């Protein structure tokens, strides 16, 4: 019985060895031929046709990937800015309401300014605060004063010059 059971295993080993005979014996895609440049990576050379089927058409984007990435980021930025523009439309409405309140409070300020002492220095400070840094620097340049520094420093220089 043992002989009969060993016989089918021998025949199955022989059929399996037929399929495994051409495969590499060690490592992935290794060959039995000694490489001309030892120590470097072995080159795999495909021995079968790798061209795509006749009906297959491959289209690739010829544009540089960096440029494509930047354009996509720009498009995303524009779409997000469109969303923020929708909220910005609400902003001017609120600002208009704030301006109406400022008009009312400016009348009160004018009445209070005549009552308070030193109000001229406060209005001068407010005038300087409302100016942009560029305008403040232009004014300092006209007077021959240094134009470097923060906005508060620029305002202090203009006040001391006046």
From Swiss-Prot:
It holds the Pfam family DDA1. Residues 71-130, 142-162 are annotated as: Disordered. Keywords: Abscisic acid signaling pathway, Nucleus, Stress response. One of its GO terms (biological process) is regulation of proteasomal ubiquitin-dependent protein catabolic process. Residues 75-93, 142-156 have a biased composition (Basic and acidic residues). It comes from the Eukaryota. The keyword Repressor does not apply. Interacts with UBC19. Binds to CAR9 in the nucleus; this interaction is repressed by abscisic acid (ABA) and is sensitive to calcium ion Ca(2+), leading to free CAR9 accumulation at the plasma membrane. Supports abscisic acid (ABA) responses and drought tolerance by regulating the dynamic localization and stability (preventing degradation by the proteasome) of CAR proteins (C2-domain ABA-related, e.g. CAR9). This is Protein LOWER TEMPERATURE 1. It comes from Arabidopsis thaliana (Mouse-ear cress).
């Amino acid at each position: 019985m043992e002989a009969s059971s060993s016989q089918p295993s021998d025949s199955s080993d022989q059929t399996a060895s037929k399929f495994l005979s051409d495969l590499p014996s060690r490592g992935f895609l290794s060959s039995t031929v000694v490489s001309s440049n030892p120590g470097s990576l072995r080159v795999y050379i495909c021995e079968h046709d790798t061209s795509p089927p006749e009906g297959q058409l491959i289209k690739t984007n010829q544009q540089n990937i960096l440029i494509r990435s930047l354009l996509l980021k720009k498009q995303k930025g524009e779409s997000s800015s469109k969303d923020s523009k929708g909220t910005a439309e609400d902003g001017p409405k609120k600002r208009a309401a704030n301006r109406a309140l400022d008009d009312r409070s400016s009348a009160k300020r004018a009445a209070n300014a005549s009552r308070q002492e030193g109000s001229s220095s406060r209005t001068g400070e407010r005038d300087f605060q409302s100016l942009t840094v560029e305008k403040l620097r232009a004014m300092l340049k006209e007077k021959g004063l240094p134009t470097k520094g923060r906005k508060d420093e620029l305002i202090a220089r203009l006040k001391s010059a006046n």
